[in-house]
């Protein structure tokens, strides 16, 4: 993502620059698909962990500040993801910096991350994206604990 942002720029990303980022990533994803095959009939969902997808979820939820407990486990349908990416693309660099879910640390990188996600979404169309702010193993453990009734999800239990 950093390399993509450095190569194309991350401050003033036009729709044309964004399309070029997607095309660059799509070439890599397409070679993966050619070697390993697709994912069938589209009755799948994507799982995104940390970084761009958590930023997208935070913006989607219109959080005043990033809240891990609200973002972690969030489901987004394809149209919601698309709308947030379109919003981010329409924002200036300063607008991205001002958003508490993005900030100065990520404002120049978030659109490169969105381009990567868009290339993946085009190669593997699906209706839903699940957002994980925690690692996959931690998320699976939390889910099992919830199913067993030992995790309240309010942050007060491990």
Where are the model-predicted features located?
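Helical "lid/coupling" subdomains associated with nucleotide-phosphate turnover
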Residues: 1-158
């Amino acid at each position: 993502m950093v390399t993509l942002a450095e190569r194309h720029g991350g401050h003033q990303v036009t729709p044309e620059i964004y399309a070029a980022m997607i095309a660059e990533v799509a070439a890599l994803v397409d070679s993966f698909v050619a070697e390993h095959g697709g994912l069938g009939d589209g009755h799948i969902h994507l799982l995104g962990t940390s970084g761009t997808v958590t930023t997208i979820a935070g913006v989607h939820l219109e959080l005043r500040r990033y809240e891990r407990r609200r973002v972690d486990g969030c489901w987004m349908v394809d149209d919601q993801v698309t709308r947030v990416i379109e919003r981010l693309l329409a924002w200036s660099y300063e607008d991205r910096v001002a958003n508490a879910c993005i900030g100065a640390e990520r404002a120049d990188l978030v659109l490169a991350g969105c381009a990567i996600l868009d290339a993946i979404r085009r190669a593997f169309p699906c209706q839903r994206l699940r957002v994980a702010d925690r690692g996959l193993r931690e998320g699976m453990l939390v889910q099992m604990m919830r199913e067993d009734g030992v995790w309240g999800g309010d942050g007060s239990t491990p």
